[in-house]
Regions:
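A generic structural motif
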Residues: 1-2
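Conserved mixed alpha/beta catalytic, RNA-binding, or beta-rich assembly cores of soluble enzyme
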Residues: 5-75
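Short amphipathic alpha-helical segments and helix-helix/interface helices
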Residues: 49, 79-83, 120
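Short, well-ordered beta-strand core segments
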Residues: 62, 91-92, 128-130
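A glycine-rich helix N-cap at a beta->alpha junction
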Residues: 78-104
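Low-complexity intrinsically disordered segments
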Residues: 114-131
Length: 132
């Protein structure tokens, strides 16, 4: 039988993707998740938001548009989760036009009120966009 010698040094592993520098943006356009029952959709949105920390350091920014801005102004688990994410360094942008439309500008409790140019720029800078 032929004997094969093992190399003196193991081959180098492929370099791991640098997840620290990757930018994941989450674009939320409604205050519920999915279509059908809004009560179920509200629960699903709570579960979605509380699962976001699992993305780790790549979670860079959350953008709230249209009905999604209600999450930044309505008391409840979603608002609490958004506040926690922001305190952990996640940037939250909230559409000012949308807040005005829903008369929520004064009620907003989390995030930075912003404009569409900032939203477009954020989308272009992100390595990955998640849209539930």
């Amino acid at each position: 039988a032929t004997q094969v010698e093992a190399p003196e040094q193991a081959p180098a592993a492929a370099p791991a993707a640098d997840t620290e520098s990757r930018k994941t943006l989450v674009l939320i356009t409604t205050d519920t998740l999915g279509r059908g029952d809004d009560e179920l959709g509200a629960r699903l949105m709570e579960n979605f938001l509380t699962s976001l920390p699992e993305l780790g350091a790549s979670l860079w920014r959350i953008v709230l548009l249209n009905g999604g801005v209600k999450l930044a102004a309505t008391e409840g688990k979603c608002l609490d989760t958004l506040k926690q994410l922001e305190s952990n360094g996640v940037s939250i942008l909230v559409c000012g036009t949308c807040l005005n439309f829903f008369n929520l500008l004064e009620a907003k409790q989390v995030g930075e009120t912003t404009n569409m140019m900032d939203v477009v720029t954020s989308l272009s800078l992100a390595d990955k966009v998640i849209r539930p």
